[in-house]
Amino acid sequence: MQQQTPLPAASLGLAASLALVAVLGPAGIDMYLASMPAMARELHTSYANVQLSLTVFLLALGGGQLLCGPLTDMLGRRRPLLAGIAVYILAAVWASQADQLTTLLLARTLQGMGAALTLVVVMSMVRDVADGVQAAQLFALLMTIVGLAPVLAPAVGGLLDAHYGWRAVMLALASLGVLTLLNSALFLPETLPRARRVSPQGMHRTYARIALDRAFLLPALALSATFFFLFAYIGGASLVYQRDFGLSASSFGLVFGATGVAVLLGAMASGRLVEKYGVARLSVTGSAAMLCGAGLALLGAWAGAGIAAVVPGMFVALFGLGIAEAALMAMAMGSQQRALGSTAALLGAIQMTLSSLATPLAASLSEWGPLPWLLFLTVAGLLVSWLTLATARVHPVHASSLGAH
């Protein structure tokens, strides 16, 4: 029986600090979900239009990484990170003052750009200091800590909205940014030595080389489909849980957070099992759980069981997502040995750009009730399973090497 290789204390400390940075993106998504119906009423617009504030955030999060990745390979990790957090803070404050939809969309776009820079740095720093099994374990540990965001953020956001309104939620995001900025300035070192920095010249050729590498492209597409599933869930959950299942904003935050625990548990399981089973097998197992969970939720809702069927089904699906996410991320990032900032940027851009398509589709389908939304999730789960199987079949040697000693 294999013994799990423990991560050094320095890596654990780095992961904790990086996780606080990585939380900014998910918190910017999850914390204000319960507020969307109230935001639509106050801004005199539709729920679908308010959902655009999530869509533009995701598009900026994806597209912004393409611009930021080469910068971090050229300038190092630390200075761009601090700049990105500062932009995130200012944009959150601006969003809290929005009195019309256009202002909100502009502020959220800027906030997404700031979050994009932070995500590129987080992914790159992990690969700066680790590779192979240790990188996979670090990614899993990172996802475990970051997994607290979908658990806590909706509950905190729901409570803030219930007592102080949605503007307080945006100010809470700004406060989280300030805390992250202080922690990063004090405890996150530069991880890219000057000797390893690269010129931004030929950026398009670098991106083309990475994108055409099947060892990168297949796990990147599978990971993108996984996030598409996640944002399809996020895009419809607020309306379906509150309108169709009768939950209040605060109750929705608690229920949504409870299903988010599954992502946390899945990431923990992935970190513990990766050395024994390898990332390929874990990713296939996780994707199968996603499909099964979504299918169970759909069948239960169709049979009239309502929220009693949907929540357990989604718990299974999101547990599988937590397993698959870290494994696929390690496979994609492990495919490259240089220009890691650009690799992380391209991975994030593909992931977030495709994921952003899920939220307006899910929001539109959820207007028709739970069944169309859950059918959409099941189809997305089928896509995840197909892409993950393709990744595992085409990359058996590469995948196994990440899971071996």
Q: Which residues fall in each region the model found?
A:
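Juxtamembrane intracellular "pre-TM" segments in multi-pass secondary transporters
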Residues: 2-7, 189-220
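Helix-breaking motifs and short loop linkers at transmembrane-helix boundaries and internal kinks
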Residues: 42-44, 76, 97-103, 114, ...
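Conserved MFS/SLC helix-loop-helix module at the cytosolic interface between two early adjacent transmembrane helices
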Residues: 63-102
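Helix-to-loop junctions at the C-terminal end of transmembrane segments
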Residues: 65-76, 266-279, 366
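Paired small-residue
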Residues: 87, 91-94, 102-110, 308-316
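Helix-loop-helix hairpin linking two adjacent transmembrane segments in secondary transporters
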Residues: 103, 133, 140-186
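Cytoplasmic helix-loop-helix junction between adjacent transmembrane helices
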Residues: 107-148
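A late C-terminal transmembrane helix in Major Facilitator Superfamily
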Residues: 331-367, 377
